[in-house]
């Protein structure tokens, strides 16, 4: 493994990528495609965070904007009011904490509180987003590939070679971040399954994911959980896509994904334990940077 692939530098933790990791999804939106409204209160969201950690989540990702196809972005203050109270409580859980947002003001306030990672579906392209992350030394960032906005993106799913074009976009964004002083070891890539892509594009990205990984200077974080393409393949509604989601996560890990972002942590963790038993060299832990009163699972 290349040295630059071995770790993901974040605010409180230097995360080892020597084994595949599981990021648990915490949606605090009323309208997410899969679990909108279930964790709308701070207490419900925190209970969900604790449940995911108990099930084995290596990281948590808290989001207050639904980015399902056709969704409209919430008001900035509304998104902030959804996310920050949950962040304030979840920071004490002892695992790396990510905020899923493109809102520069939410980024700034969350990073000021000590959040480890900004997970941005718009790859820090909104005004002030890049500068906000650059001002916070060691904060991690995940850059996702998407065209347009959630309410327009599916009309922009036109590619000559989706794998090559996704790779080119991600590499170009990394160069922009590096020019702003953000080191590559702070960056993770997401190919954006379901974002400005047809089911055929999504499957091509999975089928050729090993090729994609080899063309990128940083590792992949991949989210297939409960996505529409899985519903088309299986004929199952959103709430019945557990088996399909786990299968896609394993296929992604087998093709080089460093992190899988999932709703169903327990099942994914169990599946990865079996996968690791077949590949026993895939072992690791999350190692925090030296800091007072910080321990890692």
Whereabouts are the PLM-identified features?
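Catalytic toxin/effector domains delivered as secreted proteins or via bacterial secretion systems
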Residues: 14
């Amino acid at each position: 493994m290349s040295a630059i692939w071995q770790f993901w530098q974040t605010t409180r933790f230097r995360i080892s990528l020597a084994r595949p990791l599981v990021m648990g999804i915490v949606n605090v939106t009323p309208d997410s495609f899969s679990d909108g409204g279930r964790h709308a209160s701070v207490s419900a969201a925190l209970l969900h965070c604790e449940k995911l950690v108990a099930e084995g989540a290596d990281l948590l990702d808290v989001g207050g904007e639904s980015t399902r196809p056709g969704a409209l972005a919430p008001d900035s203050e509304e998104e902030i009011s959804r996310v920050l109270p949950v962040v304030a409580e979840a920071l004490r859980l002892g695992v790396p904490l990510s905020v899923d947002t493109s809102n520069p003001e939410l980024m700034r306030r969350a990073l000021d509180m000590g959040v480890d990672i900004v997970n941005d579906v718009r790859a820090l392209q909104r005004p002030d987003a890049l500068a906000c992350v650059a001002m916070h030394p060691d904060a991690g960032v995940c850059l996702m590939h998407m065209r347009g906005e959630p309410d327009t993106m599916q009309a922009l799913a036109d590619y000559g070679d989706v794998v090559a074009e996704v790779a080119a976009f991600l590499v170009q964004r990394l160069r922009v971040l590096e020019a702003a002083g953000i080191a590559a070891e702070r960056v993770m890539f997401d190919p954006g399954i379901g974002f400005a892509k047809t089911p055929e594009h999504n499957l091509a990205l999975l089928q050729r994911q090993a090729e994609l990984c080899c063309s990128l200077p940083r590792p992949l974080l991949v989210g297939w959980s409960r996505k529409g393409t899985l519903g088309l393949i299986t004929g199952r509604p959103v709430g019945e896509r557990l088996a399909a989601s786990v299968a896609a996560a394993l296929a992604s890990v087998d093709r080089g994904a460093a992190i899988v972002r999932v709703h169903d942590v327990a099942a994914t963790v169990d599946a990865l334990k079996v996968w690791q038993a077949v590949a026993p060299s895939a072992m690791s832990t999350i190692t925090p940077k030296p800091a007072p009163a910080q321990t890692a699972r």
